[in-house]
Regions:
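A conserved, positively charged/aromatic
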Residues: 107-141, 153
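A short helix/loop element that forms part of the nucleotide-sugar donor recognition site in Leloir-type
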Residues: 172-189
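An amphipathic, basic-hydrophobic alpha-helix
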Residues: 62-86, 96-104, 128, 183
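Short His-centered aromatic/hydrophobic patch
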Residues: 89-95, 117
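Carbohydrate-associated surface elements
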Residues: 142, 165
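N-terminal strand-loop element at the rim of the active site
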Residues: 3, 8-70, 77, 158
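Short beta-strand scaffold positions
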Residues: 36-41, 88-89, 138-139, 161
Length: 189
């Protein structure tokens, strides 16, 4: 098996579903012997990411400002230096910055571009980048249908539905009700 370098792009690592999925994918990549790199403005989840063996590169690619465009050249350099095989964009502005960075690389050196559509963003040219990955992951069949309806130029063969799961250790199947709360409810009725 060839060791891959997968670079995930997102605005920040504070909290939320996109961030949790980013950490889970990075952890799975590292455990499988691959190199996981996350590019974001940082946040409280960076220590957890790095504890998994993944790398974090601080670059504010999610700030909605014309000044964010200055990061394109640095991201392009970073993708070359890390030997990125796959660039996985998880949010709109990071996807645009990533796409512009990739377009500046020779085709033979250009990593593959993957996007994940996590939600139903308002249809627009700005949002369309999320449907323009060489592969686009949709987190549900509803998201897939939404992408095809609002971006009809999207090739359905490029879309893959990969539903979000849960960590069964964090959310065990068996209920574990609070005994005091249960006793209170039983006593009340």
């Amino acid at each position: 098996m060839r060791r891959l370098t997968v670079v995930q792009l997102l605005p920040a690592l504070h909290s939320g579903g996109v961030e949790r999925s980013t950490l889970e994918i990075a952890d799975a990549l590292v455990r499988s012997g691959h190199r996981a790199v996350v590019v974001s403005a940082g946040g409280r989840l960076v220590p957890r990411l790095e504890a998994s063996g993944a790398e974090h590169i601080a670059l504010d690619i999610g700030r909605k400002s014309p000044l964010t465009l200055r990061h394109i050249a640095r991201l392009r350099w970073m993708l070359t230096e890390t030997g990125a095989d796959i660039v996985h964009a998880r949010s709109r502005l990071p996807a645009w910055i990533g796409r512009f960075a990739l377009n500046g690389l020779p085709a033979a050196q250009r990593p593959r571009f993957v996007t994940t559509v996590h939600g139903l963003n308002s249809p627009s040219r700005y949002s369309a980048i999320m449907a323009r990955g060489e592969r686009t992951i949709c987190v549900s069949e509803t998201v897939r249908e939404y992408v095809l309806r609002h971006y009809p130029e999207t090739d359905p063969e490029r879309l893959r539905v990969i539903p979000r799961g849960i960590d069964p250790n964090a959310f065990p199947r068996a209920a574990s009700p609070d005994r005091a709360a249960r006793a209170h409810v039983v006593a009340r009725y």
